[in-house]
Swiss-Prot record:
Residues 253-297 are annotated as: Disordered. The lineage of its organism: Eukaryota, Metazoa, Chordata, Craniata, Vertebrata. Residues 255-267 have a biased composition (Basic residues). Keywords: Cytoplasm, Nucleus, Ribonucleoprotein, Ribosomal protein, RNA-binding, rRNA-binding. This is Large ribosomal subunit protein uL18. Pfam families: Ribosomal_L18_c (PF14204), Ribosomal_L5e (PF17144). GO terms for cellular component: cytosolic large ribosomal subunit; nucleolus; synapse. One of its GO terms (molecular function) is structural constituent of ribosome. It comes from Gallus gallus (Chicken). Component of the ribosome, a large ribonucleoprotein complex responsible for the synthesis of proteins in the cell. The small ribosomal subunit (SSU) binds messenger RNAs (mRNAs) and translates the encoded message by selecting cognate aminoacyl-transfer RNA (tRNA) molecules. The large subunit (LSU) contains the ribosomal catalytic site termed the peptidyl transferase center (PTC), which catalyzes the formation of peptide bonds, thereby polymerizing the amino acids delivered by tRNAs into a polypeptide chain. Belongs to the universal ribosomal protein uL18 family.
């Protein structure tokens, strides 16, 4: 079919229908959302849970949500800015941090529903494929589906780091190894060791070592926060191991204590009758003095 020019006449504008607001803003992929939200008709009022992952410039947001007519209901949430509490103070938006955030979300959710002792997940990080299966005689594994939003789902994307963390944490999320770092599209093989290196931050550690040898100034500029916190390439794996253990020990969110604000009285107090009379007398006196000066001059 050749090029067809759109004729923007009266009929075009009369029949024109705008897309949804969040589509116009480039925030929601409604094609994907429809498939993630609509539940099987034989499941009636059972919610269809989504694991929402969003990566911003300084944070990674992970949430478990389900859709209602009124809007999405958030069941549980975890953020990368919580990781300093668990010992990860730098690199809060890399692949290793995404894994930690996904793990934190999974452990927090299972703790909330009392399933954390039944579904431990994969404690030893191997980077290999792992799937959670329901235990007989116990409540079934918590199942949800990955919602990557408008992120480009290429191999090695940080969204899949959060997914792997959640699966290792004990959530049942349908997935394959094709989008994890270490998968070779040509040979169709998955190298779990490469994936484990990314989870443990060894790709960052290797780059740190490279810059230390090649360009000292670039290293100091790029990894200034690592230097400030005394984090070396050799100690990075241990840092993430401790963080994973700390997350499993206590995934519960701690609310910030409310700041007590001292209220300042802004409205002025009313003047008494005597004060009002005194002010009138002062104004009269100043007016008369000004009149006398004007007469003398």
């Amino acid at each position: 079919m050749g090029f067809v020019k759109v004729v923007k006449n009266k009929a075009y504008f009369k029949r024109y229908q705008v897309k949804f607001r969040r589509r116009r803003e480039g925030k929601t992929d409604y094609y994907a959302r429809k498939r993630l939200v609509i539940q099987d008709k034989n499941k009636y009022n059972t919610p269809k849970y989504r694991m929402i992952v969003r990566v911003t410039n300084r944070d990674i947001i992970c949430q478990i949500a389900y859709a209602r007519i009124e809007g999405d209901m958030i069941v549980c949430a975890a953020y990368a800015h919580e990781l300093p509490k668990y010992g990860v103070k730098v690199g809060l938006t890399n692949y290793a941090a995404a894994y930690c955030t996904g793990l934190l979300l999974a452990r927090r959710l299972l703790n909330k529903f009392g399933l954390d002792k039944i579904y431990e997940g994969q404690v030893e990080v191997t980077g290999d494929e792992y799937n959670v299966e329901s235990v007989d005689g116990k409540p079934g594994a918590f199942t949800c589906y990955l919602d990557a939003g408008l992120a480009r789902t290429t191999t090695g994307n940080k969204v899949f780091g959060a997914l792997k963390g959640a699966v290792d944490g004990g959530l049942s999320i349908p997935h394959s190894t094709k989008r994890f770092p270490g998968y070779d599209s040509e040979s169709k093989e998955f190298n779990a060791e490469v994936h484990r290196k990314h989870i443990m931050g060894q790709n960052v550690a290797d780059y740190m070592r490279y810059l230390m040898e090649e360009d000292e100034d670039a290293y100091k500029k790029q990894f200034s926060q690592y230097i400030k916190n005394n984090i070396t390439p050799d100690g990075m794996e241990e840092m993430y191991k401790k963080a994973h253990a700390a997350i499993r020990d206590n995934p519960v969110h701690e609310k910030k204590p409310k700041r007590e604000v001292k209220k300042k009285r802004v409205n002025s107090t009313k003047m008494s009758l005597a004060q009002k009379k005194d002010r009138v007398a002062q104004k009269k006196a100043s007016f008369l003095r000004a009149q006398e000066r004007a007469a003398d001059s």
